[in-house]
C-alpha cells in the first residue's frame, strides 16, 4: 500500500495536514475487471497510481471551496521490501520523461549518520553484482537523517 499525507505550507512556515489516506488498490485489474491489490514491490505500473490519485488530484481551499489547490511537489519513500527501490527508480524515470522530474522527489532514511539533515545523492551500482535496484547515477535520491528530523518535529510540538 501507499500511505499518503498531503501537507500545505503557509508563507510564514506554518503547515497544515490537508489530507491523509491509504492507497490499497492498483490500476491493474484481474480477468473479471476487479481492481487488484496494490503491490509496489512487484509491479512497476502500480506506482502510476501516485500520479492519478495524488499528484494530479486537487483539494478545495478551506477559505473558498470553489478554489482548488494542487500539489507543487511530491516526496516518495523509495525504501522498503525487495523490489520497492528498483520500482521507485523506474517510476521517477517515467516522471522525468514526462516532464515531472523536478517536482517528484525520492527519499529514504540514511543508514549513515551525517551532519546534514538531508543529502542529495545519485546512486550508481552499475559495477556491482547482486543488486536488485538498477541505479546508474541518473536518479536523484534524497537521504534523510530520520532520528534528527524526528527530534526536530518533536521539539516543534512543544
Where do the PLM segments sit?
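Extended repeat-based interaction scaffolds and adjacent low-complexity, acidic/S/T/P-biased segments
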Residues: 110-121, 132, 136
